[in-house]
A protein has these predicted regions:
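Ferredoxin-reductase
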Residues: 2-93, 97, 110-113, 149-151, ...
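Short structural boundary motif marking the start of a folded domain
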Residues: 3-8, 258-265
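Short acidic, glycine-rich loop/turn motifs
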Residues: 26, 46-48, 266-270, 311, ...
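Ligand-binding loop in jelly-roll beta-barrel domains
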Residues: 63-66, 108-113, 138, 341-350
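FNR/FR-type flavoprotein reductase catalytic core
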Residues: 83-257, 263
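C-terminal accessory/binding modules appended to enzymatic or scaffolding proteins
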Residues: 260-296
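Iron-sulfur (Fe-S) cluster-binding segments and ferredoxin-like electron-carrier domains
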Residues: 289-291, 306-355
């Protein structure tokens, strides 16, 4: 079950003008609970004014068994991200959920692979953990990172990436692409999009060599990168995406759902609670929270999968899904923040163990 614990901030380190890395001290009794797969995220919770805010941030590293770190980049209008950058200090305590998320990769010591990461801006955060863990665990594996930023000054983890390159000079290929800073090669100037990746494919990179590809950054970049990799011959099952938000994406349900008055049974911590939806409820999660249920959630945008549950009976309509894998969908898992009941006998189980 997803659980929050109060963790003390061990240190806050600036990465760029707009970004910081926050490291939490994890007590020995909780270290197993905060063991993570590279690529997963933490959900942080705080109250600002009268509002409870929850936000997901990717785990960037775990430098010691008793520490775990996330990176936060302040964004325009982002109450939590600006609070994190400006107000969170060492010694403060924050409510932190145990690691969650489907994105990422668990390195295997015996495996020899070729991996690709495509990131832009703060999308580097989960990649740093994945790349570092993979190269240290799989001694014969190789990683290529294509990383886009406005300039070298806005580049998060610049020193950490340089250190990784020094440590694994033959096994890590790092390509930095800047949109507002010209380097010697025009190939490394501009934005990461389909045209840029096609140009790299013609001159520098054989994209068909990679066993797995990981993509994280702005939605348009991710969509372009995914489509281009498929066009270049990479199997869809080998392409993994992590979206931080769905801004600019408008989603409409495929079917009209009349959920007002519908009752849904929510199973959590071994107990069943019956909730009734109103016309104002946009999802099963909204209805349950309104009626006092303390369910796990964070983004409410279909991205983080924190609110994942399993449909035990009945049918639901899920408006959108940016996080569940096909095998999870086939097993009956849905995102409660995106789901409404289609039948009158729906039971959803938040205790069901998901697929890692």
């Amino acid at each position: 079950m997803t659980t929050f614990h109060s963790l003390t901030v061990a240190k806050v380190e600036p990465e760029t003008r707009d970004a910081v890395t926050i490291t939490f001290a994890v007590p020995q009794a909780l270290q197993e609970a905060y063991r993570f797969r590279p690529g997963q995220h933490l959900t942080l919770k705080t109250t600002l004014g009268e509002d409870e805010l929850r936000r997901c941030y990717s785990i960037c590293r775990s430098t010691a068994p008793g520490e775990i770190s996330v990176a936060v980049k302040a964004i325009d209008g982002g109450r939590f991200s600006r609070y994190a950058r400006d107000e969170i200090k060492a010694g403060m305590a924050l409510e932190v959920m145990v690691p969650q998320g489907q994105f990422g990769y668990q390195p295997q010591p015996e495996r020899e692979g070729h991996y690709l990461a495509i990131a832009a801006g703060s999308g580097i955060t989960p990649m740093l953990a994945i790349i570092s863990a993979t190269l240290s665990t799989e001694s014969n594996s190789h990683f290529t990172l294509i990383y886009g930023n406005r300039s070298s000054q806005s580049m998060m983890f610049r020193q950490a990436l340089a250190d990784l390159k020094d440590k694994y000079p033959q096994r890590l290929q790092l390509l930095s692409i800047f949109s507002q800073e010209r380097l010697d090669s025009d190939l490394l100037y501009g934005r990461i999009d389909g045209e840029k990746l096609q140009a790299l494919a013609k001159t520098l990179i054989n994209f068909c060599q990679y066993d797995e590809a990981f993509i994280c950054g702005p939605s348009a970049m991710m969509d372009d990168a995914e489509a281009t990799l498929k066009a270049l011959g990479m199997p869809e099952k080998s392409i993994h995406l992590e979206r931080f938000n769905t801004s600019g994406i408008t989603v409409k349900r495929a079917v009209h759902v009349q959920a007002e008055g519908q009752k849904v049974t929510v199973r959590q911590d071994g107990r069943d609670r019956e909730i009734t939806l109103t016309a104002d409820d946009e999802s099963i999660l909204d209805a349950a929270l309104r009626q006092g249920a303390d369910l796990p959630y964070a983004c409410k945008g279909g991205v983080c999968a924190t609110c994942k549950c399993k449909v035990l009976r009945g049918k639901v309509d899920m408006a959108t899904n940016y996080s569940l894998e096909p095998d999870e969908l086939a097993a009956g898992y849905v995102l409660s923040c995106q789901s409404l009941p289609l039948t009158a006998d729906v039971i959803v189980d938040f205790d069901a163990k998901g697929m890692a």
